[in-house]
Amino acid sequence: MKPKFFLIVLPFMLNAVMCYAEKTHIIEPAEFEITYSIKEQPFWDIYIFRCGKKASQYFCQAKLKRNIMLANDDPAYFILSNEEMKDLNTPEYEKKYPLSTGNNDRIYRNLEQGKISTYSTVFGTHYLITEDISIPDWTIYEDSTLTVLGMECKKATTNFRGRYWEAWYTEEIPIGQGPWKLCGLPGMILKANCPKFMLIEAISIKNKNLDPVTFYNYLNYKYAPIERMEYLKKVHKPGIYPTGGNHRTIEIDDN
C-alpha cells in the first residue's frame, strides 16, 4: 500500500470499508508485538498481539499460517491436514496441534475511533462484529504482583462478558491494552487467567524487525455485519454444527 493512500483510508479501515471482501493490506507500521501462549486444558495455542499508533490486532498464529498455505495452494497444507486427521483420535493430537476457543476470530482495535472489530468464521459462515471498545470494571490489587518476562506486573480482577478474569499488567508498557478484548488497565496486560477455562501469558515481546499491523483476508472471505448479541445467540444455538452442539466462544453473555 502506498503511504499517501494509507493516510487517507486509516480512519475508516476498521469500519464499513472492511464489511465485505476487503483484501489483505497493511494498516500501519507496528510499534511492538507480543506473542501469547494459550493454555486451555488439554489444548494449547499461540496468538500474536501487534500494536501501532492508531490500531492493534490479535490473531491465532497457526490459523493465519494455514490460511496463507491454502490461499497459495501449498501442498504442505494438504499434507498437514491429512496428518491431523490421522492423529485426531490419538493421544498425540492434543500435544501436536494448536487449538483454542476463538481461534477463528481476528480482532482489530481502531484506537482513534474507539471501536473494536471481530472477524469470525463459524462453520463456513463469516461474521463481522463491530462495537465500541468496552472497558471492563477492574479491581486493582496494588500489593499483589508477579514478574512476566522480567517486568513487574500488578494484579487486577473483573467479571467481563460472562467470565471472571484475573489479569496482570505492567506499567513498564504504559498502554491500556491486552489479549483478546481485555483492556483498560494502567499498563499492558501480559497475563490473564480465567480459572478452569483459559490461561493467557506473554512469552515474548519485540519492538524491532516487526511485521506491520495488517488486515488479513488471504482467502477473500465476505463478512456479514452482525450485532454482537445476535451473533452470540446464533452461534450458541444448539445444532449449529451438523453433528449437533453449538459453537464455543470466550464471551458467553448472550441471554
Per-range role (PLM):
Residues 23-255:
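Extended soluble regions of mature proteins
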Residues 1-28:
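Bacterial Sec-dependent N-terminal signal peptides
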